[in-house]
Amino acid sequence: MSLATVGNNLDSRYTMASGIRRQINKVFPTHWSFMLGEIALYSFIVLLLTGVYLTLFFDPSITKVIYDGGYLPLNGVEMSRAYATALDISFEVRGGLFIRQMHHWAALLFVVSMLVHMLRIFFTGAFRRPREANWIIGVVLIILGMAEGFMGYSLPDDLLSGVGLRIMSAIIVGLPIIGTWMHWLIFGGDFPSDLMLDRFYIAHVLIIPAILLGLIAAHLALVWYQKHTQFPGAGRTENNVIGIRIMPLFAVKAVAFGLIVFGFLALLAGVTTINAIWNLGPYNPSQVSAGSQPDVYMLWTDGAARVMPAWELYLGNYTIPAVFWVAVMLGILVVLLVTYPFIERKFTGDDAHHNLLQRPRDVPVRTSLGVMALVFYILLTVSGGNDVYAMQFHVSLNAMTWIGRIGLIVGPAIAYFITYRLCIGLQRSDREVLEHGIETGIIKQMPNGAFIEVHQPLGPVDDHGHPIPLPYAGAAVPKQMNQLGYAEVETRGGFFGPDPEDIRAKAKEIEHANHIEEANTLRALNEANIERDKNEGKN
């Protein structure tokens, strides 16, 4: 039975052909920034594949054993079975270290790509109506991704992961009234408890991945149903999408890009070492030291705990420690992230549906707020390693702490002001080109002796030869002659590849035309010289 016969039989029963044809003809934009979400998706797939392999050999038990494995420096040392099996994966399981490091690199790439993807969504206004739900799903995905990563690198029960868990325990216990109950719910007792790794393991390999899968599916379904956003441009409106069809071109590109991400992670895992737990030793509560930093996506929370002043609050019989304010700050940031689309809609009064994106320069307030938040995040991340910087650069740790505190107040305000002025300046630059044209670099002398630069109009001119100002449509404004097809041709090739065939053909035509013009000029000059010589001979 042929595939055509099978397809006809299915279509006669379920009438699937028209729906499938319509779906595989769906169009996706080709802008490079849309690949950021794909990186997160492919990283998550790598996480699932490598995580399944690691679960075959890992034992999350905190039961104490005497290590007698392949890493000789730790032989005879008492440790938990979790740490011992993590060492066995690294040194005795075939390909275990490679898979473990690939899993760790994929976790970093997963969270970081989601953060960068969220920045793209924010700065281009892709969260506006009707996509508020997808924005909320994205925020929840980032929070769950960070929690999943934190639980993942806490499972080996090495010294660094134990320090991170101790900090988390202190923050939870510091919550007034509910802190103790939440701590017992999460850790199963006082820290360290016999149940904490078992509970983290179940959450890490079952509960959170299942939620992530459901949210990713919902996220992609909404993108598919609501159509993709796109940047303004020629022929692009709020009611269409210009790009490539999902079959076959987009599908082929997606598979190829997924393989590139997989290969990049494999390369990182093969040539770089990350989370060398054998150098840290098993967790011991008495061995907390400097230089204990979490992964980069959680470093900002550690920085917040480091720069927070030691403000303790006493309410009756309750003592609220300083780390409580860190939890409050995290909660406020999450609430602001979730509600930002509605806050912006409230202040701007914009309740329309939007399928076209915005250039960041066109919304200076939002762009400035985003840069301000980004600077705040970067300063907290840098503060998370203030002890390392103090030791490496021989600076006082107290000075580094105060630099972080002052920077968190002054830095975002300065970033807001500079970004706002840059956006206004870029808007003026675009409108100047639309009004006067593109600078050609050609200097012309006026009858009065003044020199001016000749501009190439982007549109029609009036009766006096002056360009008629064009309206700004939200798309990128050309600033160079070769972007208009002048000044030879626009070059689209790169270091690793030639120009496209049409560009090369056009370049050859221009070169040939220039050669003919040069030959004609030389011929005319030669004829003029011959004629002049004849006239001089007659005289």
Curated annotation (Swiss-Prot):
Keywords: Cell membrane, Electron transport, Heme, Iron, Membrane, Metal-binding, Respiratory chain, Translocase, Transmembrane, Transmembrane helix, Transport
InterPro entries: Cyt_b/b6_N, Cytb/b6-like_sf, Di-haem_cyt_TM
Cofactor: how and how many bound: Binds 2 heme groups non-covalently per subunit.
EC number: 7.1.1.8
Localization terms from the record: Cell membrane
Signal peptide limits: none
Record-listed heme 2 binding positions: H117, H219
Membrane topology: Multi-pass membrane protein
GO BP term (any one): respiratory electron transport chain
Cofactor(s) demanded: heme
Enzyme class name: translocase
Catalytic activity reported: a quinol + 2 Fe(III)-[cytochrome c](out) = a quinone + 2 Fe(II)-[cytochrome c](out) + 2 H(+)(out)
Example of a GO MF term: metal ion binding
Keyword Magnesium in annotation: no
Effect of deleting the gene: Cells lacking qcrCAB show strongly impaired growth in glucose minimal medium, which indicates that the bc1-aa3 pathway is the main route of respiration under these conditions.
Membrane-traversing stretches: 38-58, 107-127, 135-155, 167-187, 205-225, 254-274, 323-343, 369-389, 406-426
GO annotation, cellular component aspect: plasma membrane
Binding site for heme 1: H103, H204
UniProt keyword Iron present: yes
Similarity section: Belongs to the cytochrome b family.
Function (record text): Cytochrome b subunit of the cytochrome bc1 complex, an essential component of the respiratory electron transport chain required for ATP synthesis. The bc1 complex catalyzes the oxidation of menaquinol and the reduction of cytochrome c in the respiratory chain. The bc1 complex operates through a Q-cycle mechanism that couples electron transfer to generation of the proton gradient that drives ATP synthesis.
Quaternary structure (record): The cytochrome bc1 complex is composed of a cytochrome b (QcrB), the Rieske iron-sulfur protein (QcrA) and a diheme cytochrome c (QcrC) subunit. The bc1 complex forms a supercomplex with cytochrome c oxidase (cytochrome aa3).
Protein name: Cytochrome bc1 complex cytochrome b subunit
Native source organism of the sequence: Corynebacterium glutamicum (strain ATCC 13032 / DSM 20300 / JCM 1318 / BCRC 11384 / CCUG 27702 / LMG 3730 / NBRC 12168 / NCIMB 10025 / NRRL B-2784 / 534)
Source lineage: Bacteria, Bacillati, Actinomycetota, Actinomycetes, Mycobacteriales
Gene: qcrB
